UniProtKB/Swiss-Prot annotation:
Name assigned to this protein: Hemoglobin subunit epsilon
Similarity section: Belongs to the globin family.
Gene that encodes the chain: HBE1
Residue numbers of Phosphoserine PTMs: S14, S51
Tissue specificity comment: Red blood cells.
Lineage of producing organism: Eukaryota, Metazoa, Chordata, Craniata, Vertebrata
Tagged with keyword Cell division: no
GO biological process, one term: hydrogen peroxide catabolic process
Length: 147
């Protein structure tokens, strides 16, 4: 279980309140699909994923990215119980979707990159450390149901 200090929680919550969920979510999922093309196999119904520009402009990628980042908001609200907050999503991704849990780590790292690009100098090393801890905790929580 990940333990967050009061300062880390404040840092995460402060930045989260400024995140444009739709924009950052689409960018994060799009970047994941471009940088790690093998992840595209989980999104075969999304249509054209043939190039970086096709992926980044794909409305289904943007919509699902928003959904992913919206659910990530549950992590921000439940930092003290990430495992519980993501139990159902862990089960879905393990039992039904068969997503390799390593992909959760990749998406988390991409998310940190997106936040850094969006917030620039405001994304200090302390902010990055807190967010890296959160995305790592979420990846672990999502991987919980895997055997």
């Amino acid at each position: 279980m990940v333990h967050f200090t009061a300062e880390e929680k404040a840092i995460i919550m402060s930045l989260w309140g400024k995140v444009n969920i739709e924009e950052a979510g689409g960018e994060a999922l799009g970047r994941l699909l471009v940088v790690y093309p093998w992840t595209q196999r989980f999104f075969e119904t999304f249509g054209n994923l043939s190039s970086a520009s096709a992926i980044m402009g794909n409305p289904k990628v943007k919509a699902h990215g928003k959904k992913v980042l919206t659910s990530f908001g549950e992590a921000v609200k439940n930092m003290d119980n990430l495992k519980g907050a993501f139990a159902k999503l862990s089960e879905l991704h393990c039992d039904k979707l068969h997503v390799d849990p390593e992909n959760f780590k990749l998406l988390g790292n991409v998310m940190v990159i997106i936040l850094a690009t969006h917030f620039g100098k405001e994304f200090t090393p302390d902010v990055q450390a807190a967010w890296q801890k959160l995305v790592s905790g979420v990846a672990t929580a999502l991987a919980h149901k895997y055997h």
